[in-house]
Every structure is written in C-alpha cells, then in structure tokens.
Swiss-Prot record:
ATP binds at residues 27-34, 53, 145. The lineage of its organism: Bacteria, Pseudomonadati, Pseudomonadota, Alphaproteobacteria, Hyphomicrobiales. It comes from Rhizobium etli (strain CIAT 652). Pfam families: tRNA_Me_trans (PF03054), tRNA_Me_trans_C (PF20258), tRNA_Me_trans_M (PF20259). The keyword tRNA processing applies. PANTHER family: MITOCHONDRIAL TRNA-SPECIFIC 2-THIOURIDYLASE 1 (PTHR11933:SF5), TRNA 5-METHYLAMINOMETHYL-2-THIOURIDYLATE -METHYLTRANSFERASE (PTHR11933). This is tRNA-specific 2-thiouridylase MnmA.
C-alpha cells in the first residue's frame, strides 16, 4: 500500500486530523483537573476554548473552599485561561441548574430518597446543555476533567462509537456519577485525565504554572453552603421538616422526629431514641412522615429495582438481560468496588440481584454496572434505585407496617 493511501494518524483524541484543525471546548469548573485538561490540550496544539458555567451564587458557598462553579471558581478559571492563552467564556446557567438539579434534589429528599445531585448535573447541565453549546461553537469534542476513560468501540453502523471504562486512578474513579451519560454524549466527550493518577495531575498543574495547582478538590454537594443540605431543603420544601413518628418494624411507636430530611437509610447515630438495642433507619415513609427503624439485619438487601436505566452495552438491554440475565458487576455506592451481580429484565421491571448483598441501600441512589471488578473495567451504564427487597422477614414486616393505618 502506498504512503498516500494510508489513513492519517490519529491525534490524541482519536480524530483523523491534526490537533490544530481540531476544536475542543473544555468544561472548566475552576478546579485543578479541568485546568490541567485545558493546559494539556493547548500544549498538544488543539484549538481550545474554555467555558465555565455559573450554576449558583449562594453567599457563603461562593467563597467556600472546595466549592464549584461559583464566584471564586469562575475567577480561577479565567486566570487559568489567561495563563494558557486561550479564550474563556462564562455562561449563566443558574436558572437551568435550579430547575434540573436543585429543585429535584429537594423533591427527592421530601419523597424519602437519598438523591445524588452530581449525576443530575452531569446528565443535564454539563453533558446535555454544555455539549449542545460546544457543537454550536463548531467544536469537534467537549473535554472534561473527570477521571474516567473512553475508547473507540466502532461498529459497521456506528464507526464513531465509543465506550466508557474505569480510570487508572481507582481512588478518583468517577464512573459511578457518570452512569447516565448517553451513548450520543459519550461519542462526543473526551476525558484526557482517565489514564493519569491525581498526583500527576497536580504535578502538571504546577509545571504549567497554574494558579489552581494547590487548590482543594470540590467536596460534598457543591451548591450547599457549609455542607448543610437540610437548610436548602427546608427553604425549598418546608413540608420536609414536619414532625412525625419513629416506628419500629414490629409496629411499636418509639418516639417522634422533626422531619424525615434529617434521616437516611442505614443511619444509627442521632435517631433520638434509646431502647437498649441497636436500631437503624430501615425505611422513610414519606407519605405518613414515619421514620421506620429496626435491627441491622433488616438492612440487608440482595435485589434492587431500577428506574431511568441507561444501558451502554453492545446488545439491546432486552437482548442482554432477559432469560437468565446478564452477569456483571455492580456498585451501589461510589466508594465501593464493583461486586458480582446479575442484571434482569422481565415483566416485573429491571432489577439487579447482588450476589453478596449490601446493607442500607436507599431509593434515589445509583446502581452502576461494569464488566469486571478492577481498574479499566467497561462501564455498562446503570439506573437509579427505585426500591429494594430486604431479607424475607424484614420485607414482610415492612409491607405489613406500610399497609396499616396511621394514627391521627
């Protein structure tokens, strides 16, 4: 084959053209990770644009260490872009962020769930709205500072298709929060930090002379001042702070509480009752404002039913998970390693059987699915947990209690 018939070499982002002919929008939060992404792409010769979304402006949160996308962060992103010599734009997404992230977060707590607003933010504001803006600007890709990998996974029908994989730095793995990323979004997104350890990212930031090189990582829920989410929920949804009963699984009323928003499933400390036996929150009955408690074994869960499933396998979900199911690995908490599981789809819904079992699973949490337990495992998507099934005795007691009338 002659040289002129060879395909042009791929650049580092898997495009068949030179970096200087490839426009990339970088989502810049004002933190070290996205700043290093912009710096790396600039060094490699790409046509780089930095965009920062102003998502909220809640007083104390604006200057709180470890916040994201507020006043100080926007200024940090601007200064980084000045250092790198790239254009920087700020888009006001406060209204959109409130509608798609903050309000649903509060509503989820009122419903007795344990929501994950980072998933909603990635799903809507960052990977839907910002991605559309990047396309309007003529960009070939949207790059972010997330710790996750994507690689080409072409098919005859979709030559540009890509797949997601866990990152090299397992301690920084963000795949759990990205399970809802759609296939169309994955094909357009790029994650340059997926193969780097966090320590190397810090080193690169210092080498580039970036003002954010020693900046603290974002922590907890970015839009909540001082990390007190109950203040936000009470303000948006006053009914969440209404008093109710604390009830044992066996039906005994043990005391009262000042609002279900102060409790999470699996909680032991701070329940506010003393019975001489260790008790845990096993269910939040939002309809009747009851906090239901029981022994630790009542938290054990082996099956979770999912809603809003985002499937990223090569087959359709029905083809992969019908019959005997789809053997995979699942994470129901961001800090846990993926554990053996089987995904099923049948007339009762989409559900995951957890081989080992897990304690304290709450509605609203995510269940992310993987090909293997270790680093570099492929991400198959996942869903939000709609409900779970406990061990039989606890499940029967809970159903009987929920079916019983509540005293006026």
């Amino acid at each position: 084959m002659s040289a002129q018939n060879l395909a042009p070499p791929l650049n580092t982002l898997d495009f068949d053209k030179k970096p200087e002919e490839t426009r990339v929008v970088v989502a810049m939060s004002g933190g070290v990770d996205s700043s290093v992404v912009a710096g790396l792409l600039k060094q490699q010769g790409y046509d780089v644009l930095g965009i920062t979304l102003q998502l909220y402006d809640h007083g104390a949160a604006v200057h709180r260490a470890g916040s994201c996308c507020a006043g100080q962060d926007i200024d940090d992103a601007r200064r980084v872009c000045e250092t790198l010599g790239i254009p920087h734009y700020v888009l006001d997404y406060e209204k959109r962020f409130r509608e798609t992230v903050i309000n649903p977060f509060a509503e989820s707590y009122v419903a007795g769930e344990t929501p994950i607003p980072c998933v909603s933010c990635n799903q809507t504001v960052k990977f839907a709205d910002l991605l559309a803006t990047a396309k309007e600007l003529g960009a070939d890709a949207l790059a972010t500072g997330h710790y996750i990998r994507s690689r080409p996974n072409p098919s005859p029908e979709h030559p540009g298709r890509r797949a997601l994989f866990r990152p090299a730095d397992a301690d920084r793995d963000q795949s759990y929060f990205l399970f809802a990323t759609t296939q169309e979004q994955i094909d357009y997104l790029r994650f340059p930090l997926g193969g780097l350890p966090k320590a190397e990212t810090r080193r690169l930031a210092e080498e580039m002379g970036l003002v954010v090189a020693k900046k603290a990582d974002s922590q907890d829920i970015c839009f909540v001042p001082q990390g007190k989410y109950s203040d936000i929920i009470t303000k948006l949804k006053p009914n969440a702070a209404l008093a109710g009963e604390i009830v044992h699984l066996d039906g005994r009323v043990l005391g009262t509480h000042e609002g279900i928003l102060h409790f999470t499933i699996g909680q032991r400390r701070g329940i506010g009752i003393a019975t001489g036996e260790p008790l845990y929150v096993v269910y939040l009955d939002a309809r009747s404002r009851r906090v239901i408690v029981g022994p630790k074994e009542a938290l054990e869960t082996h099956r979770v039913y999912l809603r809003d499933v985002n499937w990223l396998g090569d087959e359709t979900l029905g083809e992969a998970a019908s019959g005997e199911g789809f053997a995979c690995y699942a994470k129901v908490r961001s800090t846990r390693a993926p554990a053996p599981a089987v995904l099923h789809v049948d007339a009762t819904g989409t559900y995951v059987d957890l081989t080992v079992g897990e304690a304290g699973i709450a509605p609203g949490q995510a269940c992310a699915l993987y090909s293997a337990p270790g680093d570099d495992a492929r991400v198959f998507g996942g869903g939000f947990i709609e409900r779970s099934e406990r061990e039989p005795a606890a499940e029967a007691s809970l159903k009987a209690l929920l079916a019983s009338p509540v005293a006026a």
